[in-house]
Regions:
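ABC-type nucleotide-binding domain
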Residues: 14, 21-180
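Cytosolic ends of transmembrane helices, especially the final helix of ABC transmembrane type-1 domains
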Residues: 1-8
Length: 180
């Protein structure tokens, strides 16, 4: 959670509008190496995901699946190689634009302080209440949210949802951003 909070607290980087539009298209990992201390989990890793293609990464614990997503989200920087979206290095894409390109559902939901609505929107003013409700309906969590005392305005606490419902909320969060 601390790493996600640190990511959300980072100042927004600015890039020219022409670069923003370039940040659509294929996702490419080209000869990426990354490790935690002396332990490399990715060594000369290369992969291309075509725009619109859906990919599931599977593997043993510690194989690097989560690391791949953290590199793609810009939470980590590779030691070697490049990570690009539409030919633009991930580090050159603003955080907001990157979130419109990538939808990611993590294994464990990272709750932020605030209401159920804020769990879905992450405070992004471009995601309207209507968009959040549509995403919740798509994920199958809308009825459970509406059944809460204050619906989408209910303040989130740990026991408000079951583990499965938190996972559905995570899917709604990813869908609300309407990634490319």
């Amino acid at each position: 959670v601390r790493r996600i909070d640190a990511f959300l607290d980072q100042p927004e980087r600015t890039i020219p509008p022409a670069r923003r539009e370039a940040a659509r298209g294929n996702v490419e990992f080209a000869h990426v190496t990354f490790g935690y201390g002396e332990r490399h989990v990715l060594k000369d890793f290369s992969m291309t995901v075509k725009q619109g293609e859906q990919v599931t990464l599977v593997g043993r614990t510690g194989a690097g699946k989560s690391t791949v997503f953290k590199l793609l989200l810009g939470l980590y920087q590779p030691e070697a190689g490049t990570v690009t979206i539409g030919g633009v290095k991930v580090g050159d894409i603003t955080d907001r634009e990157r979130r419109t390109c990538i939808g990611c559902v993590e294994q464990h939901f990272s709750r932020v302080p605030g209401t159920v609505l804020e769990q879905i929107t992450l405070g992004d003013p471009q995601i309207t209440g209507e968009m959040a409700r549509a995403a919740a309906a798509l994920a199958g969590i809308d009825a459970a949210i509406r059944a809460l005392p204050e619906g989408y305005d209910t303040v989130c606490t740990e026991g408000i949802f079951s583990q499965g419902e938190w996972q559905l909320l995570s899917i709604a969060r990813a869908a609300a951003a309407d990634p490319a």
